[in-house]
């Protein structure tokens, strides 16, 4: 089986559907004998340029190991789902299991905020 990195952007008004979409896509990968190595929900982010007069979108990153037939099925699902604005599927040489730069940045930002709050509480 091959390794793939999948990023898809969902319409911001459909953000509440993202967990169900992720569940559906991961289920189709695992049912075919594939494996999800990394799954990150980046949340709503500003777009670099407007797409369909939208300036924000909900981003999701998946690194999967799956047969080509499953990837073709996912691509078809993305194409016919109106909530998915854009998608990118890239073949990778190996499984990527470590956190992405986006996740690392979000994590470091969270720890900085927690440290700042703790220091304010300690000084009071």
Swiss-Prot record:
Pfam families: Ribosomal_S6 (PF01250). GO terms for biological process: translation. GO terms for molecular function: small ribosomal subunit rRNA binding; structural constituent of ribosome. It comes from the Bacteria. GO terms for cellular component: cytosolic small ribosomal subunit. Disulfide bonds: none annotated. InterPro entries: Ribosomal_bS6, Ribosomal_bS6_CS, Ribosomal_bS6_sf, Ribosomal_S6_plastid/chlpt, Transl_elong_EF1B/ribsomal_bS6. Keywords: Ribonucleoprotein, Ribosomal protein, RNA-binding, rRNA-binding. Transmembrane segments: none annotated. Binds together with bS18 to 16S ribosomal RNA. HAMAP family: Ribosomal_bS6. Belongs to the bacterial ribosomal protein bS6 family. This is Small ribosomal subunit protein bS6. The gene is rpsF.
């Amino acid at each position: 089986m091959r390794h793939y990195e999948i990023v898809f952007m969902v319409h911001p008004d459909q953000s509440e559907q993202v967990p169900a979409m992720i569940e559906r896509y991961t289920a189709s990968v695992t049912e075919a004998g594939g494996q999800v190595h990394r799954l990150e929900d980046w949340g709503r982010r500003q777009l670099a340029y407007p797409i369909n007069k939208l300036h924000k979108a909900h981003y999701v990153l998946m690194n999967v190991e799956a047969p080509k037939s499953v990837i073709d099925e996912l691509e078809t699902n993305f194409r016919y789902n109106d909530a998915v604005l854009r998608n990118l599927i890239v073949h990778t040489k190996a499984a990527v299991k470590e956190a992405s730069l986006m996740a690392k940045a979000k994590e470091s930002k969270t720890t900085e905020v927690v440290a700042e709050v703790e220091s304010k509480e300690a000084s009071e």
